[in-house]
Amino acid sequence: MAQPRGAGLGGLARPSGGIGPILVVEDDSDTRHALGEMLTDLFPGSRVLMAESGEAALELIRRTRPRVVILDLHLGGIHGFDFAAHVAAMADGPPPAIVALTGDASPDTVRRAEAAGFAAFLRKPADADTLETVLRPILEA
């Protein structure tokens, strides 16, 4: 179930000539690549970046300043909520909007995501229609 939210962690100003990079952070290779393909089809003007760990994603965020990060909450190494706190603490400009992606859509997890400032919540498996419904308003804001 997708639950878009308004404010979240904020977002970067819309860049001229496009909607900015989208970063997928997912440790499962099949899921990561499927999301990448769907996003490329849905947002052909955007660069879709992929990371298999939170640590790799933090480095990509520093270098590429994505507009949106789609984040698996249950990564190995760093939990999604800790990752979001690291991103929010980065001092080099406004943080990207972070969209939670998880198979755990329990009320407690949804509340924690809202409290952590996630821009939206996606339940796995996310289909193309749901991705577009949740991401387009964030990307076009």
PLM segments and residue spans:
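C-terminal output helix
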Residues: 126-135
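Acidic catalytic/metal-coordinating carboxylates
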Residues: 53, 79-82
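Two-component/phosphorelay signaling modules centered on CheY-like receiver
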Residues: 29-49
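Active-site beta3 strand of CheY-like receiver
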Residues: 64-70, 75
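Short amphipathic alpha-helix used as the core "switch/output" element in two-component signaling
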Residues: 59, 81-94
